[in-house]
């Protein structure tokens, strides 16, 4: 099989890169094994929420110079501020298809399921968000759970929201939806999850009864916070509820798998395939062959004898969570190409004792491990550049995606950087 570009990994980074390349006329294939991390995400995307020093970031561009001083190995710093901002703006134009709101010019705050407020870059329009130093626009808020669903506790949410200045003016009420169609799922707690709820409601729901139940439980509330379990493939079902109830409905992400993240994944996947891209689902890249210093072909679990050939290869396999990186006893390793590994200043790959911090709650050095790249996201093997192999997303080293709140930003910025470079390379 021959392609212009083969992408290993079908998460946010891989699909974003694939879509951008397909739009440029490249023929791409994505090798995808299992669920991507986006399926487990809140649906909000972070650009940079926190500097390595712990300082909160409000305006990305204002924090960039400080980031460069504190973490020169960060992918943003390798690419440069001009390139990062250009790709961020490019993604913000594309984000409308995902139903996201926000801007790199100012981080906003999103409400978490436990009632906290987190700085973020982009959020689904259905999620409650607040601008910095502003109050939530509604005073009367109803928090509605679902009877028998134990992974969401409205009282905890309310108690924590009351401690935030943005909600200090609000009056809260708590209620529970019965939804008789869910009685079958209530018999087995293991099946009573957001995805199962959404699947069942999509096919066996008395819609008008649900509308009336929400309106009755909401009482005099101006805004209603619901679990994100209404609408499996997109937000049309939730938007219909919002219109029918004539209430300001908002949804909060649940414990993984996250319905909001799954919607985003399916939107990206569908667009990639509509543009003519090929998804090789349930397959895993296992080894590669080189012609000189270039990758010539790869082999997968399902194609052990038949090679997959391309002019360019993109590694978007993620970090430890998705086996894009593996930790052997003596080193952290990238398992397909055995590429060079870097991390933050404290991480030394050959010294296992440097992988962890003695404080359990601290950012662990091993979490910053990943492959080394240059400013075009090309990778290195034994110190030598591989000109037609690129890395994007969380497989890259030199940053803490969770602690610094930049995992999604690194994914889309590096993905679009590679798409631009490969698209202009003959």
UniProtKB/Swiss-Prot annotation:
The keyword Oxidoreductase applies. It comes from the Bacteria. One of its GO terms (biological process) is glycerol catabolic process. Its cofactor is FMN. InterPro entries: FAD-dep_OxRdtase_2_FAD-bd, FAD-oxidoreductase_2, FAD/NAD-bd_sf, G3P_DH_GlpB_su. Its EC number is 1.1.5.3. Pathway: Polyol metabolism; glycerol degradation via glycerol kinase pathway; glycerone phosphate from sn-glycerol 3-phosphate (anaerobic route): step 1/1. Keywords: Flavoprotein, FMN, Oxidoreductase. GO terms for cellular component: glycerol-3-phosphate dehydrogenase (FAD) complex. It catalyses: a quinone + sn-glycerol 3-phosphate = dihydroxyacetone phosphate + a quinol. The keyword Oxidoreductase applies. One of its GO terms (molecular function) is glycerol-3-phosphate dehydrogenase (quinone) activity. Transmembrane segments: none annotated. Pfam families: FAD_binding_2. Conversion of glycerol 3-phosphate to dihydroxyacetone. Uses fumarate or nitrate as electron acceptor. Belongs to the anaerobic G-3-P dehydrogenase subunit B family. Composed of a catalytic GlpA/B dimer and of membrane bound GlpC. This is Anaerobic glycerol-3-phosphate dehydrogenase subunit B. It comes from Haemophilus ducreyi (strain 35000HP / ATCC 700724).
């Amino acid at each position: 099989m021959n392609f212009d570009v083969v992408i290993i990994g079908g998460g946010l980074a891989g699909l974003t890169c694939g879509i951008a390349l397909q739009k440029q006329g490249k023929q791409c294939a994505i090798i995808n094994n299992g669920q991507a991390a986006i399926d487990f995400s809140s649906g909000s995307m972070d650009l940079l929420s926190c500097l390595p020093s712990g300082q909160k970031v409000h305006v990305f561009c204002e924090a960039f110079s400080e980031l460069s001083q504190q973490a020169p190995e960060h992918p943003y710093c390798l690419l440069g501020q001009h390139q990062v901002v250009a790709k961020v703006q490019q993604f913000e134009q594309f984000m409308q298809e995902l139903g996201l709101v926000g801007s790199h010019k100012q981080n906003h705050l999103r409400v978490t399921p436990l009632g906290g407020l987190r700085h973020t870059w982009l959020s689904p329009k259905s999620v409650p968000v607040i601008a910095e130093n502003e109050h939530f626009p509604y005073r009367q808020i109803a928090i509605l759970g679902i009877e028998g669903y134990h992974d969401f506790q409205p009282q905890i949410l309310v108690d924590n929201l009351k401690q935030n200045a943005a909600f200090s003016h609000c009056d809260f009420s708590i209620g529970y939806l019965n939804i008789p169609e869910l009685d079958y799922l209530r018999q087995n707690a293991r099946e009573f999850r957001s995805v199962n709820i959404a699947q069942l409601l999509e096919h066996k729901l008395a819609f008008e009864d649900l509308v009336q139940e929400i309106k009755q439980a909401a009482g005099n509330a101006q805004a209603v916070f619901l679990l994100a379990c209404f609408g499996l493939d997109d937000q049309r079902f939730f938007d219909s509820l919002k219109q029918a109830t004539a209430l300001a409905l908002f949804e909060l992400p649940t414990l993984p798998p996250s319905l909001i993240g799954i919607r985003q994944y399916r939107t990206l996947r569908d667009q990639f395939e509509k543009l003519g891209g090929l998804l090789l689902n349930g397959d895993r890249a296992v080894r590669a062959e080189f012609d000189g210093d270039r990758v010539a072909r790869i082999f997968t679990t399902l194609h052990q004898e038949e090679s997959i050939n391309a002019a360019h290869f993109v590694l978007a396999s993620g970090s430890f969570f998705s086996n894009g990186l593996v930790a052997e006893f003596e080193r952290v390793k990238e398992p397909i190409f055995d590429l060079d590994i870097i991390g933050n200043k404290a991480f030394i790959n050959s010294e296992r004792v440097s992988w962890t911090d003695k404080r359990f709650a601290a950012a662990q050095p091993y979490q910053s491990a990943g492959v080394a790249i240059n400013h075009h996201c090309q990778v290195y093997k034994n110190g030598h550049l591989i000109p037609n192999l690129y890395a994007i997303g969380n497989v890259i080293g030199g940053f803490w995606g969770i602690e610094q709140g930049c995992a999604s930003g690194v994914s889309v910025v590096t993905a679009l950087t590679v798409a631009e470079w490969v698209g202009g390379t003959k």
